[in-house]
Curated annotation (Swiss-Prot):
Co-chaperone required during oogenesis to repress transposable elements and prevent their mobilization, which is essential for the germline integrity. Acts via the piRNA metabolic process, which mediates the repression of transposable elements during meiosis by forming complexes composed of piRNAs and Piwi proteins and govern the methylation and subsequent repression of transposons. Acts as a co-chaperone via its interaction with Hsp83/HSP90 and is required for the biogenesis of all three piRNA major populations. PROSITE patterns: FKBP_PPIASE (PS50059), TPR (PS50005), TPR_REGION (PS50293). TPR repeats lie at residues 209-242, 258-294, 295-327. One of its GO terms (biological process) is meiotic cell cycle. Belongs to the FKBP6 family. Keywords: Cytoplasm, Differentiation, Meiosis, Oogenesis, Repeat, RNA-mediated gene silencing, TPR repeat. It comes from Bombyx mori. Its main location: cytoplasm. GO terms for molecular function: Hsp90 protein binding; peptidyl-prolyl cis-trans isomerase activity. Residues 92-178 form the PPIase FKBP-type domain. This is Inactive peptidyl-prolyl cis-trans isomerase shutdown. The gene is shu.
Length: 437
């Protein structure tokens, strides 16, 4: 059997901790690296910080009396410090853990994941025979996905009655474990093997869907969108079979469906399939009021934009922005689309004027204004003239007489535009109006 436990830990522990990640041991300076006592003290402090310190007890016998048996032989005893809200860890799952292993009455671990992967938690696949039996048995008797537990493992459930000389003694060992995550890779396979009566149960549905969603998230992060889509589609199929027994369970199933359809919309957007995005949004319409759901409206807009239906896209983006006025991403999209629409209108007008050999109106008058101001007014008039609907553009207050005369002169060259002036002096207001012909 290939053991997960590092049997050569004692020989390497000083080297590993000295050459380890500085963030893990910030208080260890270069001048103290050769000091064995400081190194051991830092090991002890780190286990405390990571909640991997050995608990206070008089003896393993006294400690074991307060634990529960995981095996009828008493070779594995467990004390759950903190348990997750999910199901028991599946026997064939992949777990992410930190552990520290201690001999009786020791305060420094003889082995720990803190010395592996630069101090990162260790990911282990259960059911492969690559870790000691006692550790695997204990992990499958706690609820995940997050938990803390202590395991007291006898030699028979660890490395055998003789240990692994010279490093591993033939003695009981205490494992202090922090479980960070559980990945149920075979949930879908197990679900398909269940009878229909089991498949419809709420607990089975939730466990399977959570596993499929977790796997889909990992695939999405790796940009494997097609595989993620398959997982979300399977999650929808599982949810449709579910028969919740209470109103709360029914609401939970509904929320999971909403989540799955939204994630499918995102994945289809990533794979450039706007019609599929629309289909997912329409599925959401049958579950919730999408007019009150910003993300659904956003992807309605995305789908229409991808299909070239700019006006429809703007309509949905505006609805989404109304729900989340501070959403900068939606605001930027609307601003970009507005600019694109204006540019398109101006270019379209220029194209038709050229097609009919009509020159763009221009003024020959000379005004006592800045050339940039005159150019900006002309551009604005061309943009307004290119619009098909009524429009009104308010100019800043405080314009000089020459600036107002310049505006009037340029506007007069556009038959569909007019200038509206009201007020006097500093209160004078000037606006350019696009009339409907």
């Amino acid at each position: 059997m290939e053991f997960q436990i590092d049997v050569d830990f004692q020989n390497r522990k000083t080297e590993m901790f000295i050459n380890g990640d500085d963030d893990l041991f910030p208080e260890m300076g270069d001048e103290d690296d050769s000091d064995g006592e400081d190194t051991l003290r830092n090991i002890e402090e780190t286990t405390k910080k990571m909640m991997l310190a050995s608990p206070d007890y008089l003896s393993f016998e006294e400690l074991g009396a307060n634990m529960i048996d995981c095996m009828s032989t008493g070779d594995v005893k467990m004390l759950i410090i903190e348990e997750g809200k999910g199901p028991l860890v599946p026997v064939d799952s992949e777990v992410t853990i930190h552990y520290a292993a201690y001999w009786e009455k020791a305060v420094i671990p003889f082995d720990s994941t803190l010395t592996m992967n630069m101090g990162a938690p260790k990911r282990l696949r259960l059911g492969t025979g690559k870790i000691i039996p006692g550790l695997e048995i204990g992990l499958t008797m706690v609820k995940g996905p997050q938990a803390r537990l202590n395991l007291l493992v006898q030699p028979a459930a660890a490395w055998g009655p003789r240990g692994v000389p010279p490093r591993i003694r033939p003695e009981p060992a205490l494992f202090v474990i922090v479980l960070y995550d559980v990945k149920d890779n075979y949930a879908a396979t197990r679900f398909n093997d269940l009878p229909m009566a089991e498949q419809t149960k709420y607990e089975v549905t939730l466990r399977t869907v959570n596993a499929l969603r977790a796997d889909a998230k990992e695939l999405y992060k790796k940009k494997k969108y097609v595989k993620a889509i398959k997982n979300y589609q399977q999650a929808i199929s599982v949810l449709r079979l579910s028969r919740p027994g209470t109103a709360d369970e029914e609401l939970d199933i509904k929320n999971n469906k909403v989540n799955a359809y939204l994630n499918l919309a995102v994945c289809y957007y990533k794979t450039n399939k706007p019609k599929h995005v629309l289909n997912m949004c329409e599925c959401l319409d049958r579950l919730i009021d999408t007019e009150k759901h910003c993300k659904a409206l956003y992807y309605y807009g995305k789908a229409h934009e991808m299909l070239g239906k700019t006006e429809m896209a703007i309509k949905y983006y505006k609805k989404a922005l109304k729900l989340e006025p501070k959403n900068k991403e939606i605001g930027k999209i609307l601003a970009d689309l507005d600019t694109k629409t204006k540019d398109f209108a101006v270019n379209e007008k220029a194209m038709w004027l050229k097609a009919f050999n009509v020159e763009v109106p221009a003024t020959n008058a000379v005004y006592d204004v800045d050339a940039t101001f005159q150019s900006d007014v002309l551009d604005m008039c061309q943009s307004l003239a290119g619009r098909s609907e009524f429009a009104k553009f308010d100019l800043p207050v405080g314009l000089t007489k020459n600036e107002v005369d310049c505006i009037k002169g340029i506007v007069s060259d556009f038959g569909c535009l007019s200038v509206d002036v009201s007020g006097e002096g500093r209160n004078k207001k000037v606006c350019i109006v696009k009339k409907i012909v």
